[in-house]
């Protein structure tokens, strides 16, 4: 879920940088257009389609503009470079990176030759090249270019100039997506300080960095800090831009996503619906920005176990993205994965498999077969087979995803840790404990080093290792790990979070299996209360906890208590089975 808020924040940040350059290059194009009678009309149409994100319509116009520039000004003129850059921008938004890169490089070569390698306009083109590499997962290239842009702008404008802040923000966003949060935070803080000084603490430009910094804290599960920043940004935008401005809707969406990740689904739903109403009004019902929010609403309903409602939102988001961005765009792939997960949880495995495979094909085509994106899709597909207990299919996919993550993201990255944990979980379920333990231990060590000993993902890894020891019958090793996980989750996520409920349930299992029924019962009861409150009384997770509680009562010889609890669990399952399509696998 977190990739959704982060992805939203990332695009909003990138669009600002793109928009600033577009404004500059379009202005230059219009000046040059006086020499060509049809150029003003072409530029006007291009601007309209670009700003409304109708890229499939903008592309042929941008191609025509470039052709005219080449004919009238020559292949090495700055005006031709501007047209090449604009066409590259369109291709980048369409996810056609192979077409975009040579155009950017051509524009860059011309600008460097005419203006020199240290000119601010060269930095603007370099910035777009860095965006391209960031989106294709070539982070080392992007980092090097952003650092060059920063050096140029600091020299040209000074270390405390808003242009410098723009680059600091972009470089911080790159580190954010690389999972290097310790590098990202001081850059965001510096950018925020510059903007507060240059524009004031309540300026919309200041709100941009508040949004990005908030997303960083969400990624670290520091929801208290994130909530305050998003609330401040929302207050600024509502006051300065109005409650119905698109940027106000972006902040509503970020705050809503924070509430979603905190398990506060009602708050999240209300804010997302507000943001949707604004965006539909300002951008239209079929705009990519509308698709972002529609997709996010789907994630809320999915988290609540309202899979049918989620499906309708994911289907709508998919339809918009396929139409506006194309069937092979990365954003289309993201929605395919979200819809696949929804079908997976509805036990419609054949539908889920088809969508996951399509999402994987998009990632392999756009980013490459050994990209972080492809590894993520392989992980999803492996998890689908795991849930179907098709371990023979699941294992090689996890292993392939792990090899890619280690190569692309690094052996100590959180992406690698996630795959290690999943592969360890697979071996645990297969009873291959000797294979599982070193993987789970390695995942825990990575999270501890990368995110800290009290991060929720560290808690999850500790809990996974505890579960493994419990399955091995090594209860003395398991208990302190489960207790550690619970302590972290209660502190960082809250006592009523769903992750807290899961750990309570696992700890209850440990005490049940060791015959410590007096300790197990209140843990099961507490987990049940949380799940009923957040998910509703008829959710499958509620039925699972009821089963655990019934088993406890049977073991204690309390059949009068066990019977109604067991019957309630069976009733929930029967109702769910009746209301879902027949399982397809």
Segments the model singles out, each with a brief description of its role:
Residues 1-585:
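Intrinsic-disorder-linked linear interaction elements in eukaryotic regulatory proteins
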């Amino acid at each position: 879920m977190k990739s959704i808020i982060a992805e939203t924040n990332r695009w909003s940040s990138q669009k600002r940088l793109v928009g600033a350059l577009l404004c500059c290059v379009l202005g230059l194009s219009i000046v040059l257009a006086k020499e060509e009678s049809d150029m003003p009309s072409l530029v006007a149409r291009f601007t309209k389609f670009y700003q409304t994100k109708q890229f499939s319509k903008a592309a042929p116009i941008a191609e025509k503009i470039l052709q005219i520039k080449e004919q009238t000004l020559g292949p090495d003129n700055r005006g031709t470079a501007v047209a090449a850059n604009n066409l590259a921008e369109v291709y980048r938004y369409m996810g056609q990176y192979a077409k975009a890169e040579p155009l950017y490089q051509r524009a860059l070569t011309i600008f460097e030759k005419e203006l020199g390698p240290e000119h601010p306009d060269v930095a603007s083109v370099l910035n777009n090249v860095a965006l391209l590499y960031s989106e294709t997962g070539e982070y080392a290239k992007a980092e090097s270019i952003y650092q060059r842009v920063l050096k140029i702008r600091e020299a040209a404008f000074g270390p405390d100039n808003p242009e410098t802040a723009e680059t600091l923000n972009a470089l911080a966003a790159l580190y954010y997506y690389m999972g290097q949060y310790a590098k990202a935070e001081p850059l965001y803080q510096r950018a925020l300080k510059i903007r507060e000084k240059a524009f004031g603490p309540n300026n919309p430009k200041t709100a941009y960095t508040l949004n990005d910094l908030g997303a960083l804290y969400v990624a670290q599960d520091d929801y208290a800090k994130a909530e305050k920043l998003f609330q401040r940004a929302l207050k600024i935008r509502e006051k300065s831009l109005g409650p119905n401005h698109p940027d106000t809707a972006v902040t509503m969406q970020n705050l809503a996503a924070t509430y979603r990740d905190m398990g506060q689904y009602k708050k999240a739903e209300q804010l997302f619906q507000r943001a949707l109403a604004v965006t539909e009004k300002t951008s239209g019902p079929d705009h990519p920005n509308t698709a972002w929010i529609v997709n996010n609403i789907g994630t809320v309903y999915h988290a609540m176990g309202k899979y049918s409602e989620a499906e309708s939102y994911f289907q709508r988001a998919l339809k918009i993205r396929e139409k506006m961005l194309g069937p092979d765009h990365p954003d289309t792939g993201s929605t395919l994965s979200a819809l696949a997960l929804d079908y997976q949880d509805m036990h419609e495995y054949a539908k889920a498999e088809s969508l996951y495979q399509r999402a994987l094909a998009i990632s392999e085509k756009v980013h490459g077969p050994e990209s972080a994106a492809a590894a993520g899709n392989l992980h999803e597909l492996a998890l689908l087979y795991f849930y179907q207990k098709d371990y023979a299919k699941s294992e090689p996919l996890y292993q392939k995803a792990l090899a890619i993550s280690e190569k692309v993201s690094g052996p100590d990255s959180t992406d690698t840790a996630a795959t290690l944990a999943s592969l360890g979980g697979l071996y645990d379920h297969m009873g291959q404990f000797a294979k599982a333990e070193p993987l789970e231990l390695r995942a825990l060590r990575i999270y501890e080093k990368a995110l800290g000993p009290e991060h929720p993902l560290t808690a999850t890894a500790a809990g996974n290792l505890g579960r493994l020891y419990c399955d091995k019958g090594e209860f003395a090793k398991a208990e302190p790990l489960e207790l550690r996980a619970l302590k972290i989750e209660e502190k960082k996520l809250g006592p009523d979070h769903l992750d807290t409920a899961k750990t309570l349930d696992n700890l209850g299992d440990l005490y049940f299996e060791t015959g410590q029924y007096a300790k197990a019962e209140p843990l099961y009861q507490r987990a049940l209360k949380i799940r009923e409150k957040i998910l509703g009384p008829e959710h499958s997770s509620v039925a699972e906890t009821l089963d655990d509680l019934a088993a406890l009562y049977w073991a204690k010889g309390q059949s009068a208590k066990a019977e109604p609890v067991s019957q309630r669990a069976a009733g929930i399952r029967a109702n769910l089975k009746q209301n879902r399509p027949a399982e397809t696998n």
